Amino acid sequence: MGLSDGEWQLVLNVWGKVEADIPGHGQEVLIRLFKGHPETLEKFDKFKHLKSEDEMKASEDLKKHGATVLTALGGILKKKGHHEAEIKPLAQSHATKHKIPVKYLEFISECIIQVLQSKHPGDFGADAQGAMNKALELFRKDMASNYKELGFQG
């Protein structure tokens, strides 16, 4: 399940592109998530009222939250699988406070891949996509493992 050094390098190379515009990437990821999986919007009291894509694009709060999500994920990816210290508090809040099911983590992972394909096609070929999929799968597996320890069957 682990990634090779080369795979981590592919992940971090494309992540460097994300970091050039974290709020823009984060906003696009969340809009794709909410449009593609409207049920996920119910977990976000702050965004439930946003019904159209235009309303979502105009929301500074959504942009800020997108930046928060991708900043946290970037911190995890940079640990190259040695991310237990970063995962534990994230799993704790997502299991006990926000009650975000693992399925929703799968949904947002798909959206991240789609945004990277759309925004960075030249830097996100098949090898990079495969590596990012593996990195996001590792993240989800470790979140799920922590959820289980916390007694959350999300």
Curated annotation (Swiss-Prot):
Q: Which GO terms describe its cellular component?
A: cytosol; extracellular exosome; sarcoplasm
Organism equals Homo sapiens (Human)
Quick check: keyword Chaperone in the entry?
no
Q: Which gene encodes it?
A: MB
User: Which family does the record assign?
Assistant: Belongs to the globin family.
Q: Which PROSITE patterns did the record assign?
A: GLOBIN
So where does heme b get bound?
Answer: 94
This enzyme's EC code(s): 1.7.-.-, 1.11.1.-
Q: What is this protein called?
A: Myoglobin
- Clinical condition linked: Myopathy, sarcoplasmic body: An autosomal dominant, slowly progressive muscle disorder manifesting in adulthood with proximal and axial weakness that progresses to involve distal muscles. Patients may lose ambulation after a long disease course, and some individuals develop respiratory or cardiac symptoms. Muscle pathology features include sarcoplasmic bodies in skeletal and cardiac muscles.
The UniProt catalytic activity note for this protein reads: Fe(III)-heme b-[protein] + nitric oxide + H2O = Fe(II)-heme b-[protein] + nitrite + 2 H(+); H2O2 + AH2 = A + 2 H2O
- Positions bound to nitrite: 65
Q: Which principal EC class is assigned to this enzyme?
A: oxidoreductase
Modified positions (Phosphoserine) are 4
